[in-house]
Amino acid sequence: MFAQQTSNESAIKKQEAVVAAAQANVDKFEAQLTVADSLISVGNQMITESKSEMKSAENDRKKIEKEYLTSKKVLEKKAASKNKEEAASAKADLKSLDNQYKQDIKHADLRLKEATKKSADGTKNVEKGKNLKKTAGEGLKKARATLEAAQAKLDTMKNPPQEKSSSKKKK
């Protein structure tokens, strides 16, 4: 009887280890789902931010172009002046204006490029999150089923069905 009890206890311990492993697997998939949800929300946030940054960069670019054309027109008129000093000064100012315009446009284009990259990264994060959520969801279903089966087996081992003992008493 003692050997049978020891064997039963070791079987229960093994089954408890199986239950613990199944629970760890469930926890792993739940953590993956949390990561997936986080990726999706961060990706959506990045996309939203990038849209406003793109709009801002495009508006700045339009404003820079408009100001440049206005200033250029005035300076070109002065450069065509008969007064040589005024014309030389206007030409120098025009050169300076062109250089400033190139720098400002380059900066606006860089902001636009960064916003576009941020949008692409956000889209990648959303896709990655959706894929991870799908695989983790499927894995979680299987892991929960395994956990329930292992727990049921453990419960049965700890509390054997009472029908067998009651049928022996009737005989």
Question: Where are the regions a protein language model picked out?
Answer:
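Extended amphipathic alpha-helical heptad-repeat regions
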Residues: 4-171
